[in-house]
Structures are given as structure tokens and as C-alpha cells.
UniProtKB/Swiss-Prot annotation:
This is Bursicon. The keyword Disulfide bond applies. Keywords: Disulfide bond, Hormone, Secreted, Signal. Pfam families: DAN (PF03045). Heterodimer of burs and pburs. The bursicon gene is encoded by two loci: burs124 contains exons 1, 2 and 4, and burs3 contains exon 3. Exon 3 is trans-spliced into position in the mature transcript. This unusual gene arrangement has existed for at least the 150 million years (MY) of mosquito evolution since the split of the culicid and anophelid family lineages, but is younger than the 250 MY split of the dipteran suborders Nematocera and Brachycera (containing the Culicidea and Drosophilidae, respectively). Residues 47-137 form the CTCK domain. PANTHER family: BURSICON, GREMLIN 1. Final heterodimeric neurohormone released at the end of the molting cycle, involved in the sclerotization (tanning) of the insect cuticle, melanization and wing spreading. Residues 1-31 form the signal peptide. One of its GO terms (cellular component) is extracellular region. The gene is burs124.
């Protein structure tokens, strides 16, 4: 189930739901769980344009701090067993990313400029115009480690079922 950024996702209490941590700009964010025992709502979308100081650097020039913007926040992500095909997983990994960009030109002072070169270097920089939760880079199925290999599996009903199924196939 994928929800729009303004609508919280809703999962039945019996659903297997694992939330992935989103790393963005050095911040870790995990969705907050709200609701009663029957229905759980995960509301985590909080992706905003944030003012930052960006230091522009160019070889031979004096670094120049300038006011800029960055996308900072958290977005809801999950992995769950498919409702229609219980042998498959449904994933939704969302990341706080730019939606449009602005460009600016800045002059840097370059005291080590050689003869004939200008003492000021004009450089271009970009910053996000707006930010929103968008799908992260796709995950290759080959990169997903099964729970049994990652040592996270418990002795639940499904784990026992799959182990028995593997034994029957190997006989």
C-alpha cells in the first residue's frame, strides 16, 4: 500500500511491516507508529527545504561560505508481505529529494592566479527549489538478503513451513 505524502499509510495489525532507515544528510529517521492495536498508522513524511551554509571551493581561490538550501527530512518507507501473493514482498522506499532547482553565480577571489588570469573566478552553484518524498533508487532483488541468511528469522509458522518445504525438495 503506497500513500500520498499527506495521507498516512494504514496496515492491519497482522501484516508484516518492516520500516527501513533513511539516511539523508547525516540524519536517521524512523517512522512514528500511532494508533490502537487493531490498526496502525505510520506518519513519517517530513521533507522540507532547509537553509544551510554551503562553502564554495575552487583550486587556487579563497573558499567562500554562501547561504543556500538543502532537502532535509524523513519519508515513510516499508516492506511487507504482498496481500495477494504471500510469497512476494512489496517495497516502498521513499527519500527526501529535490523537486526543481535554482541556480546562482558567485564570484570567488583567487589570489594565486597566474599572470594573465583573472583574480576573480565566476562559479555556478545549484540548490533545491522545493523538496518532496520521492522513490529512492531501486533495490535489486539480488541485493536483498533473506532473513534466514541475515540471522533475523524466528521460529514462527512461516519459517518452519519454508524449512520443511526445502527439506522435501532436497529429498
Amino acid at each position: 500500500m503506497i500513500s500520498s505524502p499527506s495521507t498516512p499509510a494504514t496496515f492491519a495489525a497482522g501484516s508484516l511491516v518492516l520500516l527501513c532507515l533513511v539516511l539523508g544528510g547525516g540524519h536517521f529517521a524512523l517512522a512514528q507508529k500511532e494508533g490502537n492495536d487493531d490498526i496502525q498508522h505510520y506518519t513519517a513524511d517530513d521533507c522540507q527545504v532547509t537553509p544551510v551554509i554551503h562553502v564554495l571551493q575552487y583550486p587556487g581561490c579563497v573558499p567562500k561560505p554562501i547561504p543556500s538550501f538543502a532537502c532535509v527530512g524523513r519519508c515513510a518507507s516499508y516492506i511487507q508481505v504482498s496481500g495477494s501473493k504471500i510469497w512476494q514482498m512489496e517495497r516502498s522506499c521513499m527519500c527526501c529529494q529535490e523537486s526543481g532547482e535554482r541556480e546562482a553565480s558567485v564570484s570567488l577571489f583567487c589570489p594565486k592566479a597566474k599572470n594573465g588570469e583573472k583574480k576573480f573566478k565566476k562559479v555556478s552553484t545549484k540548490a533545491p527549489l522545493e523538496c518532496m518524498c520521492r522513490p529512492c533508487t531501486g533495490i535489486e532483488d539480488a541485493n536483498v538478503i533473506p532473513q534466514e541468511l541475515a540471522a533475523f528469522a524466528d521460529d514462527g509458522t512461516l519459517t518452519s513451513y519454508f524449512q520443511k518445504g526445502q527439506l522435501r525438495n532436497s529429498e
